[in-house]
Every structure is written in structure tokens, then in C-alpha cells.
Amino acid sequence: MIGKLSGKVDSQGDDYVIIDVNGVGYLVYASGKTLGTLAEGEFYKLFIETHVREEHIHLYGFLTLEEKIFFNLLQSVNGIGTRMALFILSSLTPSDIQIAVNNEDKNIFKAISGVGAKLAERIVLELKGKVAKISSGSAIIKESLNIKNITPVASNEVIKALVNLGFSRFEAQNAVQGIITQNPEISIDELIKTALKNRNSNFS
């Protein structure tokens, strides 16, 4: 399973980008917002969600961990698949989505082409208990977010990321718990880096 790709943008399509990693081109589907940020020939790091099916393997890329989290959250709503989740993220940021859900603002979602009244209502109802409460207008999961503010979904994403990087789920859970106990203020990025560093030290 691929959890992250670091490489140069080779080319782009309407809904995907080709990332060149040491001469190997990976086709990665992404939201319109992400694709609009990428520039051909420039180097980027993308968080990857890998979907394995009998007939194909699809990679979905995100510039931030929070976008990946909301990609998966949206798919937990009945009637939303990968394509619709990316389409919604092309129109709304994770912060926009969280604020709309907390405010029960269905019109934000209804304004998106392809999202009808019933689906907009389901998004609000089914995500209401899954997103962290925030003050109106405030950002959600910042790059320097403290672990004490991470939602259970975000914590699971950290564990999932470590599993994608070679940990067993048991190892990942123990690593996260141990690091947080020692440093409750650690950020998501530092948590992952520390877990990898500790694991490498144990193997050396």
C-alpha cells in the first residue's frame, strides 16, 4: 500500500496528475483545488489513499492530511463515492465542510453541481457527529495542530498512515500512544516522524 509520494509533476489531466518518482510515473487522482495548486516540473509531497479493487488500483492524492481525512469522511456518507468526494473537495475546503456541518448549512452542499437536497441533508446528518466542533470561521486541522485537539478520525488516520509505512496496526497503536504520553503537545507531522525514527532505531 502506498501512503505517500514525493516527486515532480510530469503532467496533468482533468482529474489526475502524473507524479514522477525516480523515473516511475504514478497516476494520482486529486481534487480540482489540489490540481490547481500543482505546477508542472515542480516537486511535491502528496498524502496517498490507495484503493485496491480486483480490476484496478487507484491512487488518490492530497497536499494536506486534513484533505485526505475529509475525503474518507465524505465517503462514509451514503451515496458518496470517490468521484463525488473529490468533486466536493474541489468546491469546498475541509474547513468549509466542517463549518457547514456544524452549522447544519445544507445550502453550502446544495450549491455544488450534482449534490441534491437529499444528499446535502445526509452529509449534514451523517457527518454531524464525526467532525470536531469549532468556532465559526476558525480553521480546523492546522499544519501545527496539537494532538490534544485531534478528532478520533484524525488519530485513526495517523495510525493508518503508519500502517501504510510498514507498521503492523498493533505497532502503530502502541507507537502513537507511547509518543503522545511523553509529549501531549506533539504535532501530527512530528508524531509520524518520531514513530518512524523510533522504529528505525529499534531495528538498527
Curated annotation (Swiss-Prot):
BP GO annotations: DNA recombination; DNA repair
Main location group: cytoplasm
Record's subcellular location: Cytoplasm
Assigned keywords, A-Z: Cytoplasm, DNA damage, DNA recombination, DNA repair, DNA-binding
Superkingdom to which the source organism belongs: Bacteria
Family to which the UniProt record says this protein belongs: Belongs to the RuvA family.
Domain notes: Has three domains with a flexible linker between the domains II and III and assumes an 'L' shape. Domain III is highly mobile and contacts RuvB.
Name the record gives this protein: Holliday junction branch migration complex subunit RuvA
Description of how the protein assembles with itself and partners: Homotetramer. Forms an RuvA(8)-RuvB(12)-Holliday junction (HJ) complex. HJ DNA is sandwiched between 2 RuvA tetramers; dsDNA enters through RuvA and exits via RuvB. An RuvB hexamer assembles on each DNA strand where it exits the tetramer. Each RuvB hexamer is contacted by two RuvA subunits (via domain III) on 2 adjacent RuvB subunits; this complex drives branch migration. In the full resolvosome a probable DNA-RuvA(4)-RuvB(12)-RuvC(2) complex forms which resolves the HJ.
NCBIfam families listed in its UniProt record: ruvA (TIGR00084)
Region (Domain I): 1-63
Flexible linker: annotated span: 143-149
GO CC annotation terms, alphabetical: cytoplasm; Holliday junction helicase complex; Holliday junction resolvase complex
Molecular-function annotations in GO: ATP binding; four-way junction DNA binding; four-way junction helicase activity
Pfam families the record matches: HHH_5 (PF14520), RuvA_C (PF07499), RuvA_N (PF01330)
Function, as annotated: The RuvA-RuvB-RuvC complex processes Holliday junction (HJ) DNA during genetic recombination and DNA repair, while the RuvA-RuvB complex plays an important role in the rescue of blocked DNA replication forks via replication fork reversal (RFR). RuvA specifically binds to HJ cruciform DNA, conferring on it an open structure. The RuvB hexamer acts as an ATP-dependent pump, pulling dsDNA into and through the RuvAB complex. HJ branch migration allows RuvC to scan DNA until it finds its consensus sequence, where it cleaves and resolves the cruciform DNA.
Lineage: Bacteria, Pseudomonadati, Pseudomonadota, Alphaproteobacteria, Rickettsiales
Key word Phosphoprotein present: no
SUPFAM superfamilies given in the database record: DNA helicase RuvA subunit, C-terminal domain, Nucleic acid-binding proteins, RuvA domain 2-like
Region (Domain II): 64-142
Region: Domain III, residue numbers: 150-204
